[in-house]
């Protein structure tokens, strides 16, 4: 196989895309990073970069036609997926495929596939396109419930409603966190689950492979900590892998899928799936013999996927900083790195207005509990320069 002539265009150039571009660069693959703002993290390591509105069909199609990439790899949801469907019909390679990208960009599409077509176990749910519909569906779902915008990313607009006086506030929060013109929400019965996992699932030319389950803690719908492996029963793991294979087979294409699942005893509930590397999977940068970004690349270009191994119990902690500056300066890294079991990735984001994920702490230890505690200790050292 000659991969030197491959050209990859990344749509969305955040921190996950940066690690993917680095993986491609290491194999001599030409890379193009695209986003709506200049100097995005992945642009800092790509051969070429372009700033466009990826929701603008004309701008997106013109750039793709001009650059003629071998593979088009979406990193975010805020892309004109109708254009990707059109381009795929003209023999462009969309990763994993245009169908998967379009279906997973909104919760209504993917929940319909999972619950109605595949009959996967999910929480009780309903959709609402107006505030009155929202109030109506609450009557059948009951308290407590989770509300999420139909279209959003990184936990924006999500909240758990436990009391009646939180209902109006949660609707407004969902509207403010919704992406684009979509105003619909999904209302889900709150499952009092034991834990939640991400099961990184790799579809490739030789079949489907799984990484060890990743446990994680979320706050306000966004990842804060993750660890691998997460201990679970053989029964729950087998069910999780079965669900992950079923949903990813239905979506199709090659690449890494981040399948989010709720576990209660040996019961497994499908939550969401992303057709790309997952933020909780950043722990694989330290935990696995082949990290999720390298796996995504290998699956896309047709390179072998050997046995995926967890080398040691590991954890990650999102470096979430708060400030208001166009030139962020981060300090405390020297103190955090004094521990030989700690590594750090700083994403290269300069602007911060409010809270923003600026990097990740990676740790390894003899067990995940110690790795997680070590990540929290390292995280405590890191802050913006005052």
Swiss-Prot record:
Residues 112-301 form the ATP-grasp domain. Coiled coil: none annotated. Pathway: Purine metabolism; IMP biosynthesis via de novo pathway; N(2)-formyl-N(1)-(5-phospho-D-ribosyl)glycinamide from N(1)-(5-phospho-D-ribosyl)glycinamide (formate route): step 1/1. Mg(2+) binds at residues 260, 272. It is an enzyme of class 6 (ligase). N(1)-(5-phospho-beta-D-ribosyl)glycinamide binds at residues 15-16, 75, 279, 349, 356-357. Keywords: ATP-binding, Ligase, Magnesium, Metal-binding, Nucleotide-binding, Purine biosynthesis. GO terms for cellular component: cytosol. It catalyses: N(1)-(5-phospho-beta-D-ribosyl)glycinamide + formate + ATP = N(2)-formyl-N(1)-(5-phospho-beta-D-ribosyl)glycinamide + ADP + phosphate + H(+). GO terms for molecular function: ATP binding; magnesium ion binding; phosphoribosylglycinamide formyltransferase 2 activity; phosphoribosylglycinamide formyltransferase activity. Gene3D superfamilies: 3.40.50.20, ATP-grasp fold, A domain, ATP-grasp fold, B domain. Its EC number is 6.3.1.21. One of its GO terms (biological process) is 'de novo' IMP biosynthetic process. InterPro entries: ATP-grasp, ATP-grasp_carboxylate-amine, ATP_grasp_subdomain_1, PreATP-grasp_dom_sf, PurT, PurT/PurK_preATP-grasp, PurT_C, Rudment_hybrid_motif. ATP binds at residues 107, 148, 153-158, 188-191, 196. Belongs to the PurK/PurT family. HAMAP family: PurT. Involved in the de novo purine biosynthesis. Catalyzes the transfer of formate to 5-phospho-ribosyl-glycinamide (GAR), producing 5-phospho-ribosyl-N-formylglycinamide (FGAR). Formate is provided by PurU via hydrolysis of 10-formyl-tetrahydrofolate. Homodimer. This is Formate-dependent phosphoribosylglycinamide formyltransferase.
């Amino acid at each position: 196989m000659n991969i030197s002539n491959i050209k990859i265009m990344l749509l969305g150039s955040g921190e996950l895309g940066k690690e993917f571009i680095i993986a491609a660069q290491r194999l001599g693959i030409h890379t193009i990073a695209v986003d709506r703002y200049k100097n995005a993290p992945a642009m800092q390591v790509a051969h070429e970069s372009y700033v466009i509105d990826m929701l603008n069909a004309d701008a997106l199609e013109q750039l793709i036609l001009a650059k003629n990439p071998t593979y088009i790899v979406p990193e975010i949801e805020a892309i004109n997926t109708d254009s990707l469907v059109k381009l795929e019909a003209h023999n462009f390679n969309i990763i994993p495929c245009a169908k998967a990208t379009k279906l997973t960009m909104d919760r209504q599409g993917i929940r319909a596939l999972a619950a109605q077509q595949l009959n996967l176990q999910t929480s009780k749910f309903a959709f609402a396109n107006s505030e009155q519909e929202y109030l109506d569906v609450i009557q059948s779902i009951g308290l407590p419930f989770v509300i999420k915008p139909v279209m959003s990313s990184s936990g924006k607009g999500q909240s758990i409603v436990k009391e009646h006086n939180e209902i109006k506030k949660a609707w407004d929060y969902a509207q403010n966190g919704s992406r684009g013109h979509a105003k619909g929400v999904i209302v889900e019965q709150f499952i009092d689950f034991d834990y939640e996992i991400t099961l990184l699932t790799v579809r490739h030319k030789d079949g489907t492979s799984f990484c060890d389950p990743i446990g994680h803690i979320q706050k306000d719908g966004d990842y804060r900590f993750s660890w691998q492996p997460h201990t679970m029963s053989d029964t729950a793991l087998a069910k999780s892998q079965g669900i992950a294979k079923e949903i990813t087979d239905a979506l199709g294409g090659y690449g890494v899928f981040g399948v989010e699942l709720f576990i209660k005893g040996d019961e497994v509930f499908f939550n969401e799936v992303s057709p790309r590397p997952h933020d909780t999977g950043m722990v694989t940068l330290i935990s696995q013999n082949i990290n999720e970004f390298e796996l995504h690349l290998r699956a896309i270009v047709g390179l072998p996927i050997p046995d995926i191994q967890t080398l040691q119990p590991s954890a990650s902690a999102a470096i979430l900083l708060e400030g208001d500056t166009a030139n962020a300066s981060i300090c405390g890294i020297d103190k955090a790195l004094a521990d030989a079991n700690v590594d750090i990735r700083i994403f290269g984001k300069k602007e911060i207005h409010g809270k923003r994920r600026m990097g990740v702490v990676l740790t390894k230890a003899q067990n995940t509990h110690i790795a997680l505690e070590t990540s929290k200790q390292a995280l405590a050292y890191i802050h913006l320069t005052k």
